[in-house]
Amino acid sequence: MKKRNITEFQVLSEIIRKQPHIKQKEIAENLGITVQAVSEHIRNLVKEGYVKSRGRGEYVVTEKGLRKLKNWISEFKDYLDEINTAVYRYKDIWPAIADEDVKDGETVYLFMKNGLLYASKQPKGEAKAKALYGGKKGEDIAICEIKGIIDVPKGKVIVFRIPPEVVGGSRAVDFNLIKENIDNLDDYVIATMGTVAYVVACKLGLKPDIRFAVPEAIVNACNRGCNVIALITGKMAEKVIKKLDNAKISYTVLDATKENK
């Protein structure tokens, strides 16, 4: 319905509620519009034959107007039903990444990987859902009717203490130590804190996933099932470690300073 039609529907509804004695000022106050606007809408309703004027402020809805009002009610109800459906569909639909090709309507099992929700046709745990809209492997799909609990084990953290610039910065880093430990992990998120740590990551060919609000972001990543490689400059590591302790997240701390020979 157009905005003008909605307002005329409201005016017509007010008339049928209070006919034949109509007070335009009262209608204007009820609808939050001006008296002039009410007067204009009434003139249009009379012109269209939906309302009949008896003079002296008396108006009655005609049979034609009654049919039109019923038609508007039906249209408005359909419109509200569409909105209501959209609201609840939005609320009940969740995105997931297809771990394999998934068709509309298929049952899928849900699991977390790299902090993202995946859907597979193979049992991956007790949580399952229905694929409302399927897709190819790696595409986003829409899932609904989620049942069960999605298992999200907490990730672990390896904290590398990176020497600050005053003791050599990246020039004093044992890059082999970092590489060896990274090679032992399959999936991980890279976090850097401090300029030197960022430079070290770049020299290792690593693209940091976390650079801002680092302690909090590391905890959030672990809570979503991600393992984290944290390159932290100097004393900043203490802040990260304290946050991990408070969140009861498992971690290992390694000093990445190169040994002097």
Swiss-Prot record:
Disulfide bonds: none annotated. One of its GO terms (biological process) is regulation of DNA-templated transcription. InterPro entries: DUF7839, HTH_CRP, UCP_HTH_arc, WH-like_DNA-bd_sf, WH_DNA-bd_sf. Coiled coil: none annotated. GO terms for molecular function: DNA binding. PANTHER family: BSR5907 PROTEIN, HTH CRP-TYPE DOMAIN-CONTAINING PROTEIN. This is Uncharacterized protein MJ0558.
